Amino acid sequence: MRRVMLWIMAVMFIAGGKAILAKPAVSRDADVSLYGPSFPVGDLKFTIPSKWKIEPVESPARGGQWRVPPLHGEGDGGEVVVFYFGPGIGGSAKENIEAWIGTMFNAEGHPAAAEVKHHTTGGFKISQVVIFGTYNQVVSLPGVPPVPKSNYGLLGAVIENPQGNIYWRFTGPEALITANLPLFNKVVDSVKPQEKAP
């Protein structure tokens, strides 16, 4: 029972707390440079863009948290979070993508259309989702309802890993998300095992 509760809590944390497909797909081969340091998550590591500013994590469920500056210095910035819970906790790629979709709505109040893709990089199976619409941002306070943010986007990625899946989530204004999609793809595809100590 405890393991089931941990799994449920993990999926809730990843989902948000907790566009549409006419957007052209961005090639994974886009010319995007990464200059930032390597960041460890579980037994893996990723290359982080220097323009992403690391922040103190807001909960123990977050393995890392970054603020992405707004476009042209105006409006809202974006938030990138990576989650890691260990082996067997956090849910499958399908479950988490469904949870992410459940936080985004279209103008009629229905779940927003989502673009889901799967690929393999460096031997790791990766599932990704792109969603645009109204984001129901969950506030981590009892009794406080979600805060709707219109014209927002969500990028999500799940890297399947025997030592525990890695979950990436990037939320922000639609234009910011669209502009950063190639960079997000590069971060996800930068996954590598950490070097083992001799």
Language-model region placement:
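N-terminal targeting sequences that direct proteins away from the cytosol to non-cytosolic compartments
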Residues: R2-I8, I14-G78, Y84-F124, F132-P198
